[in-house]
Amino acid sequence: MKRLARSLYLQVLLAVVLGALVGHLFPATGASLKPLGDGFIKLVKMLIAPIVFATVVTGIAKMGDLRKVGRVGLKGLLYFEVLTTVALAIGLVVARLARPGAGMNVDPATLDTKAIASYTNGAQAHGTVDFLMNVIPRDVADAFARGDILQVLLFSVLFGAALAALKDKGRPVLEFVDGLSLVLFRIVGFVMRLAPVGAFGAMAFTVGKYGIATLLSLGKLIACFYATSALFVVLMLGLVLRWCGLSLFRFLRYIKEEIFVVLGTSSSESALPLMMRKMEKLGCSKPVVGLVVPMGYSFNLDGTSIYLTLATLFIAQATNTHVTLVQELEILAVLLLTSKGAAAVTGGGFITLAATLSAVGNIPVAGLALLLGVDRFMSEARAITNLIGNGVASVAVSRWEGELDQARARAVLAGTVPEEVEPANEPEPPAIPAGAGLHG
C-alpha cells in the first residue's frame, strides 16, 4: 500500500483497470464519468501554453547565439520529416501485408455519412497554406487563450530572441520568466496528483460508451495498429536511442508515469509538461527540449502517421477499392503534407484522413464511417507512440547538437541518480552573454 501511495504510475494503472471495469459492468454510469477525464485534460492544457513560453524564452535567452536556435530548429524539423516518413511507410507496408480490411465487402453507398460530415467539411480548409497561416496568431492573447502550441512557440522564440538582443537590460525580465517556470512546474506537480481520477473517468467513458463489442468487431485493424506502433517504437526509436548510447527499455521505464497518464486520458498533451521536465532531468539540453518537444506535437506525430496510412488502405480494402503501387506512393506523398499539424485541430486525424482521401480521389471518403466506432480504442496507442517519439526526438537532437549528457542519462536510466537532482548541463540562471544579439 505504501508503494501504491507513492507511485503515480501504479495509481494510474489501477485507475485505468477500475475505469474499464466500471464502463463494462455499468455502461451508463461509465459514460457519465466523461467530465472527470475532460476536467483533468483541461487542467493540464491550462498550463501548456505558459510552460512552453517560459521554457523556450529562458532557453533561447540563456543560449545567446541565435544562429544556434535556428540550427536546433532546423535539425529538429529534419529529424521529424525523416521519422514521420518512416512511420508512414511502415503503416503502408503492414497494411499491404496484413490486409486488415480484406473480406469486409462494404458498399460505400450503404454507409451513413452524416456522422463524418464535420470531418469532411473540415478537410476543405486543411491545406498547407492554411496550416502555415495558422502558425501566425491574430494576437498573442488569443494564441494563449486557445492554447495553440505552434502560435505560442512562434511568439516565444521571438520574445526570447528579443530578450537576448537586450543583453543586460533584459536580465530582470529573464529572472521573472525563470521564476515563473519554477512556479508553473510546481503547479504541474499539484495537477498530476489528479491523474488517476482523470484516467479513471476517461477509461470508464470509453468502455461505457463504445463497449467491448465495438472493439471486437474490427479487432484485426486494431491489432495491426497496436502491433505496428510497437514495432516502430522497438525498431526505429530503439535504433535512435542506441545511436545516443541509451537503452530503449530503460527509457520507457523512466517515462512510465507519463505513458500511463496518456494511456488513461488518450491525450499525449496531458503529459507534455511532465515530459519536458523529465527530458531536462535526463540530461538533454534545456533549449533543445524547449524547442523540439512543443514542435513535435505538430510535426512529429509518429503514432498518428502510422494510423493514417493503415486506415487509408484499410478503407480501400474494406470497400474493395483497388489501389496500385503508384497510388500507394501518391498516398504517402499526400500524407507527408496533410499530416503536418494534425494535432492542431479537434478531430485532426479524421480531418487529415478526409483531406487525403479527397486528394487521392479513388478511395471513398464515406469509408471513414467504418472507423468512427473503433477510432477511440486506437487513440491510446497513437498518443503513447507520439509521446515516446517526441521524448526520443529531444534526446536525438541533443545528441546531434553535442549537448546530451550521456553519462548522466545512463545513470538516470539505471536509477543511480535521483530524478529530483537538477541536470548538470542546465545553464546557471540568468546570465546573458555580453555579445548576444539577433545575429549571434
Swiss-Prot record:
Keywords: Cell inner membrane, Cell membrane, Membrane, Symport, Transmembrane, Transmembrane helix, Transport. It is a multi-pass membrane protein. One of its GO terms (cellular component) is plasma membrane. It comes from the Bacteria. One of its GO terms (biological process) is L-aspartate transmembrane transport. The keyword Isomerase does not apply. Its main location: membrane. The chain crosses the membrane at residues 8-28, 40-60, 74-94, 147-167, 187-207, 221-241, 288-308, 354-374. It is found in: Cell inner membrane. GO terms for molecular function: fumarate transmembrane transporter activity; malate:proton symporter activity; succinate transmembrane transporter activity. Residues 419-440 are annotated as: Disordered. Signal peptide: none annotated. PROSITE patterns: NA_DICARBOXYL_SYMP_1 (PS00713), NA_DICARBOXYL_SYMP_2 (PS00714). HAMAP family: C4_dicarb_transport. Belongs to the dicarboxylate/amino acid:cation symporter (DAACS) (TC 2.A.23) family. PANTHER family: AEROBIC C4-DICARBOXYLATE TRANSPORT PROTEIN, PROTON/GLUTAMATE-ASPARTATE SYMPORTER. Responsible for the transport of dicarboxylates such as succinate, fumarate, and malate from the periplasm across the membrane. This is C4-dicarboxylate transport protein. The gene is dctA.
